From Swiss-Prot:
Membrane spanning residue stretches: none
Species of the source: Homo sapiens
Signal peptide: 1-25
Name assigned to this protein: Epididymal-specific lipocalin-8
Localization: Secreted
Domain of life: Eukaryota
Record's GO cellular component terms: extracellular region
Molecular functions per Gene Ontology: small molecule binding
GO biological process: response to hormone
Amino acid sequence: MPGAAEALPTVTVTLVAGAVPPASGALTAHCIGGFWREVGVASDQSLVLTAPKRVEGLFLTLSGSNLTVKVAYNSSGSCEIEKIVGSEIDSTGKFAFPGHREIHVLDTDYEGYAILRVSLMWRGRNFRVLKYFTRSLEDKDRLGFWKFRELTADTGLYLAARPGRCAELLKEELI
């Protein structure tokens, strides 16, 4: 359907990372906070993979049960920044954001990678996207990548991120 990709609301505005480490039982700012670079996206909805704005990186800050997400986008070669605040909901590692969006952390080691499920309702349809993030600007975390591939084996549509200037600027806190 022509123009559909432009009409799809940006799913990736609310990406977050962090789950409860098995030993601690509580989400803490030092575990979740900081820089994350988007490395992979998997969805069975092609519109999600062709969005005009592409997330390159996130900077997360946890304060109580609120999570502030600073998102760096690449929009036709220009960097855009957006901040959004979500709240932890019924289970640790699951957050709700404005616009009927939820993020659930499926797997993370906090130091290298995080795998998230983003869910949202748009035009009466449920969309689900799996996202793979690393702390590094390079693709160093192969264990996280293989876990992402295992979780998304039945999805069918993948998009691997390219290194981007916006993620670099966000990591250096220049934007």
